[in-house]
Amino acid sequence: MTPILRVWSRWLIPVLLLALAAALVMVNRSFVEAAPARNDFTARWEGGHSWISERVSPYDPSVSLQAQERVYGRPANERRGEDPLHFLYPLPALIIFAPLGLLEFELAHAVWMSVLEICLFASTWLWCGTLHWKGSGWMTAALLGFTVMWFPAFESLVLGQFAALEALLLAAGLTAVLARRESVGGLLLAAALLKPQLGIGLVLFVTWWAIFSGRRQLVGWLATGVALMAGLSLLLDPGWPMQMIRQVFDYLGLAVILSPVARVSESLGLGQAGTLAISAFLLAYLFWEWKGSLGGEERRFLWTAALTQAIFLLIVPFGIVSNLVLLLFPILLIVGAWYGRLGRSVDAPAMVLLALLASASWLLSIGSLEQSEPSFWVLFGLPLLTIGGLLWVRWWSTRAQAWSELGAPLL
């Protein structure tokens, strides 16, 4: 390449990327302007806007009321089960939402949707790299299509859910951990606690694994990240933890706070005791797998991390369909192990499997959309199906000496 072409490419590529990003925002803005503002992003934008523009706490009741007026055109009727649209995130999350609060709502929503779309693709790319798996061109295209077209991803984008960004933070964090970039991995995993119920499982597992694997620097950087977020946010607003807890209490009578396990227990008439018993059983089994993962081996670490992700999606509160985008990691691990075992011959079956999974997620969710209630079969069924898939590939994923040996014949 000549020096002139080198200079042109150095400038042209960033310009093209910026042009593509601007086009994506414009397309998303057209969608936002045609769609009602009944999405989760409304409450987060109101919180960021009030804090950055008016210096009003995002937990102030007036901020929730503004979000309710934007969504319902009136105050929420909690007796009907309407979401009070509280900010409901830890104060450090303002590092994401405050800059968006500087933009008018429609533009901010379009920018946020664009960021989430990029996050979904980027997290898929990182997971594939972490698993050392590269499919054929057709398989890659099918996988990228699945990334944004199955129902949890669609709902995450339309509602402006943080789960897509959470997927990227976790993917980047684990990628850095395996590359032994302790500072980057620790800080990214600390940032994953911006949505605590989604990040806590993997953060606890990585901390446990790092302690017993001699990765003290990783633990130190993770603790530093958590301490910085907590300390700086408490300096800005010492009372925010109690204000957030009060907002959580406002959801106690609403179905949205239930975990998938709690929904199952409720439907079976087992009540809170059933929820605690099922959750305790799942956690006990998970802890047993955590103990077996000690030793620092990459294959067992990744498989256990994927299992942790799937199990925690069953037991954490505020179980919503959008959170299931985090299942992409265990799904990729399952398909990757299958692919490594049988080679390119699995292309067609794997693509059919992804198509069936995407179709099922839509078919099972369509009826629930009219009732504004998540599908029980999607919320509970998909994580359970994923756990079954992980158990199916457990031997290949944890006993082979290298990922490349997954294709070796069984003895």
Can you annotate each of these PLM segments?
Residues M1-V177, E182-S183, W208-L328, L332-Y339, ...:
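Primarily membrane-embedded glycan-assembly and transfer machineries that use lipid-linked glycans
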Residues L188-L189, W221-A227, T304-A310, D347-S359:
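Central hydrophobic cores of alpha-helical transmembrane segments
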